Amino acid sequence: MLKEFKEFALKGNVLDLAVAVVMGAAFNKIVTALVSYIIMPLIGLIFGTVDFAESWSFMGIKYGMFVQSIIDFIIIAFALFIFVKIANTLMKKEEEEEIEENTVLLTEIRDLLREKN
């Protein structure tokens, strides 16, 4: 049972997921800082306040906090979209190169077989 767990835990997909979770947490801090210290002050110039969480409320319902969370989510989602798009582009290039190497190797094998016959 321990051996099976070790095989499972050391599989590429599990390790990739673990790395992704850690990187996602670190990336979240970067995006939160971007939103809090750069984007929200710019939006604050338009609306007159930076902190929607405290200033936008009605009878104890802090809908400003909800608006701020939506802005955070949109920025994080967009940044992740760009990151995944770039990663997919890079992975596609690697796959194309690998296919070309296989094609060259198969062509050489075919040519050698033709020479033997």
Swiss-Prot record:
Membrane-topology annotation of the record: Multi-pass membrane protein
A GO cellular-component term linked to this record: plasma membrane
Domain of life: Bacteria
Pfam families registered for this protein in UniProt: MscL
UniProt KW keywords: Cell membrane, Ion channel, Ion transport, Membrane, Transmembrane, Transmembrane helix, Transport
GO molecular function: mechanosensitive monoatomic ion channel activity
Family annotation (Gene3D superfamilies): Large-conductance mechanosensitive channel, MscL, domain 1 (1.10.1200.120)
Annotated coiled-coil segments of the chain: none
Biological role: Channel that opens in response to stretch forces in the membrane lipid bilayer. May participate in the regulation of osmotic pressure changes within the cell.
NCBIfam families xref list: mscL (TIGR00220), PRK13954.1 (NF010559)
Subunit structure: Homopentamer.
UniProt protein name: Large-conductance mechanosensitive channel
SUPFAM superfamilies, per the entry: Gated mechanosensitive channel
Main location as per UniProt: membrane
Organism: Staphylococcus saprophyticus subsp. saprophyticus (strain ATCC 15305 / DSM 20229 / NCIMB 8711 / NCTC 7292 / S-41)
Family statement: Belongs to the MscL family.
